Amino acid sequence: MTQFWPAPAASGAVRATVPVPGSKSITNRALVLAALAEGPSTLRGPLRSRDTELMATALRALGADLQDGPEGSWQVAPGPLRGPAEVDCGLAGTVMRFLPPVAALAEGRITFDGDPRARERPLDAVLNALRALGADISGDSLPFELQGTGKLAGGAVTIDASASSQFVSGLLLSAPRFEQGVTVTHTGEPVPSLPHIDMTVSMLRAAGVEVDDSKRDVWHVAPGPIRALDLDVEPDLSNATPFLAAAAVTGGTVTVPGWPERTDQAGDAIRDILARMGATVELGPDGLTVTGPAELAPLDIDLHDVGELTPTVAALAAFASGRSRLRGVAHLRGHETDRLAALQRELSGLGGDVEQTDDGLLIEPRPLTGGNWHSYADHRMATAGAILGLLVPGVLVEDIATTRKTIPDFPGMWSSMLGAVD
């Protein structure tokens, strides 16, 4: 039976400090590197959510030893990679795209499957690349099977990563363990979400791996050891954006502690986005503080590199003082759901005026009314519905539990934030 969550309306300007759990992107990259490292690693402040638990469970199945440490940390000791093993990807793009290269280093049969929607998501780029590098794989999408020999030759490979930067990151993360390393060349439309590849490169270098990304659309990773990690995981900045948006739309003030001064996280772009919409944005020792304006300004913005922020920005644009254009996000049609079609459908269902373009959305603010907001098993669609519900009474968000994909207790955090209003 479908469950609908009554999105709470704000009774005034939100004023709150909202600690946000660790970054999913950093946590899942760190787990892969730790499983392939030359010694035991410690991850402090990792995200504990469905996506990261799926990654941890899969790495255990492949041979890594992951134990709970003090204060929510993870202790990871690498072990011989071997099958037979079964990997449940759920709906986690990082699991379905980062772990096939790891499994190619294992000895034995590894099978991959996931949620029904995951079977529709593109995987052929990474699977064909692995075949070209010497892997034995049956299938081009979930479910598929990989027969490993305990090693992979590696070498040079050309892929089309225009559907997802995760195709590149997945190959790079395991490449130090390939006999020849890897040289990945992208051909096709521009790679989306480049900050995620920058994050992968930074984390590899921090682990002592030699990476050359000096040439556009070409990445070379040399073979060699991966140093053990001793890592404090940053807060998840993309997951922080709905809470900062709450300040923006209610004219309130929200602080997210621990916001890094420098980061490769795509979510850091929310600072510029909110400032362009008229909010006051301050980064200081207490974290990032956003104070909403009297009126939100519309914006024309290319979100190609930060497409994951599109649902949050679309919700903000629905309350702006004029028409907004969100560009550069055609690749969102292949995410957890077709996010462009979903945003148009759901905003229109509440009375909005939304038009799809070739690569984005045109949003003309209109008076909105309550109604059902379908999440399509997409965590960012669900949080966008919560933002709208702050100012639109009667918004009912379908399956708010889907937010557990990346936030362990979004409803509780949202309610706590709304407990502090003027």
UniProtKB/Swiss-Prot annotation:
Keywords: Amino-acid biosynthesis, Aromatic amino acid biosynthesis, Cytoplasm, Transferase. This is 3-phosphoshikimate 1-carboxyvinyltransferase. The lineage of its organism: Bacteria, Bacillati, Actinomycetota, Actinomycetes, Pseudonocardiales. GO terms for cellular component: cytoplasm. The keyword Transferase applies. Monomer. It is an enzyme of class 2 (transferase). Phosphoenolpyruvate binds at residues 24, 93, 121, 166, 339, 380, 405. GO terms for molecular function: 3-phosphoshikimate 1-carboxyvinyltransferase activity. SUPFAM superfamilies: EPT/RTPC-like. 3-phosphoshikimate binds at residues 24-25, 29, 164-166, 308, 335. Pathway: Metabolic intermediate biosynthesis; chorismate biosynthesis; chorismate from D-erythrose 4-phosphate and phosphoenolpyruvate: step 6/7. Catalyzes the transfer of the enolpyruvyl moiety of phosphoenolpyruvate (PEP) to the 5-hydroxyl of shikimate-3-phosphate (S3P) to produce enolpyruvyl shikimate-3-phosphate and inorganic phosphate. Belongs to the EPSP synthase family. It catalyses: 3-phosphoshikimate + phosphoenolpyruvate = 5-O-(1-carboxyvinyl)-3-phosphoshikimate + phosphate. The active site is at 308 (proton acceptor). PROSITE patterns: EPSP_SYNTHASE_1, EPSP_SYNTHASE_2. InterPro entries: Enolpyruvate_Tfrase_dom, Enolpyruvate_Tfrase_sf, EPSP_synthase, EPSP_synthase_CS, RNA3'P_cycl/enolpyr_Trfase_a/b. It is found in: Cytoplasm. The gene is aroA. Its EC number is 2.5.1.19. GO terms for biological process: amino acid biosynthetic process; aromatic amino acid family biosynthetic process; chorismate biosynthetic process. NCBIfam families: aroA (TIGR01356).
